[in-house]
Amino acid sequence: MSTPTTPPRDAWARLRALTPARIALGRAGTSLPTASHLEFQLAHAQARDAVHLAFDPAPLQAVLQQRGRRSVLLHSAASDRHLYLQRPDLGRRLSDEAAEQLRGTTAVHGGGADLAVVVADGLSALAVHRHAGAMLEHIDALAAHEGWSLAPVTLIAQGRVAIGDEVGELLQAQAVIVLIGERPGLSSPDSLGLYLTYAPRVGHTDAARNCISNIRGEGLSYAEAGHKLGYLLREAFRRKLSGVQLKDEADRPLLGTDTASQAAPRNFLLPE
């Protein structure tokens, strides 16, 4: 009779407590355990639900009103969710009515603010519902501290990242921030993305934008995202650029400091 052998230790197992990522799932023969398989199906269903969840701007509008912030509710050129998913280009532009409404807002209240903020549902309205209000509070506090003027917050249904370029251009803002629901992952249906563009103009590519991703409770905190955004905005205004020419060095250690001299962490997969 053969002696039972102990399965090899999974080097990833202890990391499950540190991340919601699908690692160290175990196995049952050549397949996944039933529990892991069911968790996968649930995560997939949650991701699909997040994509199709309708954007409800009313609670965010109420919060902004309580803070004394003006907001404008707009719609992209994609008339519904089905068209939005089939035609990404329509989500990058305002509808004709929305563009005219924004021109009217600029004519009445004036343009030329330092910073315009756009909130768009993107591919996860759930992320916007959960995190946009708190992130806007950090942005407002940052702007107040730096003395930056703010345009009205624009809330956009069926919007994609590039729609911020048109909004920023119509508002004549120096820079635009887009808060948008990111494409849901299997462990993150509510991840909020933040995109910064200096001198926004229709036709900009992704190369002109800086991205701060995965803003959520289990990812990047609001405070950490605000810290990175503060660095990027200050540098964008100082250097008059954004995108690939502007690197996020907010946490870069300074030469000669204790932080810079610390040894690099060991690879946990290597033996001690």
UniProtKB/Swiss-Prot annotation:
HAMAP family noted in UniProt: EutC
Purpose: Catalyzes the deamination of various vicinal amino-alcohols to oxo compounds. Allows this organism to utilize ethanolamine as the sole source of nitrogen and carbon in the presence of external vitamin B12.
Catalytic function, reaction form: ethanolamine = acetaldehyde + NH4(+)
Protein name: Ethanolamine ammonia-lyase small subunit
Keywords: Bacterial microcompartment, Cobalamin, Cobalt, Lyase
Pfam families: EutC
EC number, as in UniProt: 4.3.1.7
Family per record: Belongs to the EutC family.
Hydrolase among keywords: no
MF GO annotations: cobalamin binding; ethanolamine ammonia-lyase activity
Positions that bind adenosylcob(III)alamin: 161, 182, 211
Subcellular location, record wording: Bacterial microcompartment
Needed co-factor(s): adenosylcob(III)alamin
Pathway(s) annotated for this protein in UniProt: Amine and polyamine degradation; ethanolamine degradation
GO cellular component: ethanolamine ammonia-lyase complex; ethanolamine degradation polyhedral organelle
Cofactor mode of binding and number, as noted: Binds between the large and small subunits.
PANTHER family: ETHANOLAMINE AMMONIA-LYASE LIGHT CHAIN, ETHANOLAMINE AMMONIA-LYASE SMALL SUBUNIT
InterPro entries in UniProt: EutC, EutC_C, EutC_N
Record's subunit section: The basic unit is a heterodimer which dimerizes to form tetramers. The heterotetramers trimerize; 6 large subunits form a core ring with 6 small subunits projecting outwards.
